[in-house]
Amino acid sequence: MGNSGFYLNDTQNCVFADNIKLGQMESPLQDQQLILGTKSTPTAAKLNAKEGLKIDISNTNAQSATIDFSIDADTLSKLILDQIQKGLVDAIIKDITNSLIQEVIDRIISDKNLALTKAFKNFSLSEKIQCNGLFTKSNIGTLLGGTEIGKFTITPDNVNSMFLISADIIASRMEGNVVLALVREGDSSPCAISYGYSSGIPNVCSLRTAVNNTGTDPVTFSLRVGGMDSGVVWVNALANGDSILGTTATSNISFLEVKQQTNG
C-alpha cells in the first residue's frame, strides 16, 4: 500500500490514493481553507457560519488543527423571538378590519414616534340593546348622555403608549341621528364622540379615535349610544327591536396599542 492523502505537488494541492493522483487543485490552499470534492476537480472551500452558529478554527499548530462548531445563543434567541413577534403581528393584522388597518397606517405615517406593539384586543356585542338615553347640548360633555352598551378593560403592555380604538356598531332608529360616546373610567367627560344616522333601517355607526395611556394598570372604557335630542336607538336590531333578518347581528370594538420607538 503506497501513500494516500493530500500532498503539495509543484505548488499545487493534490489528492493521492495509493500513489495515484486523483485530482489537482487549481491554486494552493489559503489560511483556513479546506479541500472539497466536486464533480470535476477538487476545489478550495471555506466554512462560513450562518445566523445562530459559530465556527472556531484553530490551526496555529499544524499537527493538531481543530474546527469547533457551537451555537451562538444570543443571536439564535433574538432570531427566534423576532420570528415569533412577526408571526404574532401577522396574525393580529389578519383579524383587524380593513378600516382599522388604514387608521393604524395613517396614524403611524403621520406620527413617526409610534410603532406597533403586540397588544390587541377585540370585543364583540351580539345582544340586542335598547338605548333610551339621549344626547343633548346639556349632557354631551358629561357622563350622562345615551345608554351604556358595554364596558371593556385593556391591560397595556407599555407605559406612555397610545390606544387606537375602532368601534363599528349596528344601530337602528326611526329616522334620525345616532351618537356614540367613548368614556374612559375616571374621566369626567367622553374621550371621543362620533355620529351616525339611521333612516329606519340598520346602519353601521363607527367611532375611530386615539387615546393616550400613561401606565401599565388595566384601563376600562365604556361605550354609550343614544339618539341626538330624541328617539330610541336599538343596537344589533331593527328600529322596532326585532332581529335583523331573523339572525344575530354583531357589533365590534377593537383596541390596538402602539408605543413610542426607542431606537430612533
From Swiss-Prot:
Keywords: Plasmid
Protein name: Virulence plasmid protein pGP3-D
A Pfam short name: Pgp3_N
